[in-house]
């Protein structure tokens, strides 16, 4: 008889931390959680602080701000002034010099939220990838979430980096985002940009595919033993199908003449369309950051300048963009000291 005496492998600090992070608990932490949870907490907390405590001039907290009329649709964390350039505006930096009130006033909170928000989104993407690896799934959820990350980073970081300062990024708020969209249209003719068109096609196409798919599955559910189509008729561990792909295929073949006959191809297409739309939009925003022009029909502009009777969709678009610029520029770029005569500014409900 042979007796082998083995010595237990010593476990280092990394192994102990790895075990603790990946322990089975109600909310999985993981290595990605070290990036996700602090950054998400600070970004959300920073936004709530900026839209309540700071906008009330440091007199109200979260609850009392909303009780006394704070509107989350119009409140926003404003971008730094143009004079700040692309400084990261650290609280301890030369601009704020450790003064929290001064830091908030110069826009440090915006940079804080934008950077922590970006890293928080990346952490959430890594979280999906990490959990997928641990449970043996493919990483397509993480790949899909790269689309929203690309849009956020391109709009809030890449665009202002290509411009003069953080000032040209959108402020962090609902109404502020819509104002930024007007800015993109007036100064970049964004709606006539092919990357924007591909983005719209991807997002609306994804919504259409989602609606069609959900309705089709609901239409072709198998009945349970009581001849009823209830949600109780499904269990996650059942081996049989819960709806009829054959019936769905026949239905759409009659509607369109063609239909998906392969579930794998169908669901990949539902992944591909919106994610591609998000990525193309992000590419387009990077182009705007570099002031690349798209669909400027110079020949039409020249003819319109010579012939007052010449009018096309594009020449009307030029007038719209000029109106947006004259309306926004004076208040949106006060550092430029624009002065427009009263007769050229839009009045009333002109826009």
Curated annotation (Swiss-Prot):
Residues engaged in binding pheophytin a: 128, 141
This protein's GO CC annotations:
chloroplast thylakoid membrane; photosystem II
Enumerate the CDD domains for this protein: Photosystem-II_D2
Question: Which Pfam families does the UniProt record give?
Answer: Photo_RC (PF00124)
A single Gene Ontology MF term assigned here is: chlorophyll binding
SS bonds (residue pairs): none
Query: Which residues make up the binding site for chlorophyll a PD2?
Result: 196
User: EC number(s)?
Assistant: 1.10.3.9
> Which PROSITE patterns does the annotation name?
REACTION_CENTER
Its GO biological process annotations read:
photosynthetic electron transport in photosystem II
Q: What membrane topology is annotated for this entry? A: Multi-pass membrane protein
Q: What InterPro entries would the database entry show?
A: D1/D2, Photo_II_D1/D2_sf, Photo_RC_L/M, Photo_RC_L/M_CS, PSII_PsbD/D2
> Where on this chain does chlorophyll a ChlzD2 bind?
116
What keywords tag this UniProt record? Chlorophyll, Chloroplast, Chromophore, Electron transport, Iron, Magnesium, Membrane, Metal-binding, Oxidoreductase, Photosynthesis, Photosystem II, Plastid, Thylakoid, Transmembrane, Transmembrane helix, Transport
Catalytic activity, as annotated: 2 a plastoquinone + 4 hnu + 2 H2O = 2 a plastoquinol + O2
Q: Does the keyword Transmembrane helix apply?
A: yes
The enzyme class is: oxidoreductase
**Family the entry assigns:** Belongs to the reaction center PufL/M/PsbA/D family.
Q: What else is known?
A: 2 of the reaction center chlorophylls (ChlD1 and ChlD2) are entirely coordinated by water.
Question: Sorted alphabetically, which HAMAP family does this protein's record hold?
Answer: PSII_PsbD_D2 (MF_01383)
**Subunit relationships:** PSII is composed of 1 copy each of membrane proteins PsbA, PsbB, PsbC, PsbD, PsbE, PsbF, PsbH, PsbI, PsbJ, PsbK, PsbL, PsbM, PsbT, PsbX, PsbY, PsbZ, Psb30/Ycf12, at least 3 peripheral proteins of the oxygen-evolving complex and a large number of cofactors. It forms dimeric complexes.
Protein name per Swiss-Prot or TrEMBL: Photosystem II D2 protein
Species name: Porphyra purpurea
Query: Gene of origin?
Result: psbD
């Amino acid at each position: 008889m042979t007796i082998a005496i083995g010595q237990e492998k010593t476990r280092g600090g990394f192994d102990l931390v790895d075990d603790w992070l990946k322990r089975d608990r109600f909310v999985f932490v993981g290595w990605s959680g070290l990036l996700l949870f602090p950054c998400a907490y600070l970004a959300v907390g920073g936004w709530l602080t900026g839209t309540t405590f700071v906008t009330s001039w440091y007199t109200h907290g979260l609850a009392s701000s909303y009780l006394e009329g704070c509107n989350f649709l119009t409140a926003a964390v404003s971008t730094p002034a143009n004079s700040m350039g692309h400084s990261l505006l650290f609280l301890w930096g030369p601009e704020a010099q450790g003064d929290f009130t001064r830091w908030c006033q110069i826009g440090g909170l915006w940079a804080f939220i934008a950077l922590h928000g970006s890293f928080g989104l990346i952490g959430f993407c890594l979280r999906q990838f990490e959990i997928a690896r641990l449970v043996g799934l493919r990483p397509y959820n993480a790949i899909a979430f790269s689309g929203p990350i690309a849009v956020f980073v391109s709009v809030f970081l890449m665009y202002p980096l290509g411009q003069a300062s953080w000032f040209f990024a959108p402020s962090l708020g609902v109404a502020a985002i819509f104002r930024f969209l007007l800015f993109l249209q007036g100064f970049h003719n964004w709606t006539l940009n092919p990357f924007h068109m591909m983005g719209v096609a991807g997002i609306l196409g994804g919504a259409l595919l989602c609606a069609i798919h959900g309705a089709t599955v609901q239409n072709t559910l198998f009945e349970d033993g009581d001849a009823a189509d209830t949600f109780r008729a499904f269990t996650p561990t059942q081996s049989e199908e819960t709806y009829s792909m054959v019936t769905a295929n026949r239905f759409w073949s009659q509607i369109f003449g063609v239909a998906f006959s392969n579930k794998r191809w169908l669901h990949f297409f539902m992944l591909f369309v919106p994610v591609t739309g998000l990525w193309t939009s992000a590419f387009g925003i990077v182009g705007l950051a570099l002031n690349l022009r798209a669909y400027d029909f110079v020949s039409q502009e020249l003819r319109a300048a010579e012939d007052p009777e010449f009018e096309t969709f594009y020449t009307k678009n030029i007038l719209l963009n000029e109106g947006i610029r004259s309306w926004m520029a004076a208040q949106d770029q006060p550092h430029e000291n624009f002065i427009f005569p009263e007769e050229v500014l839009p009045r009333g409900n002109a826009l």
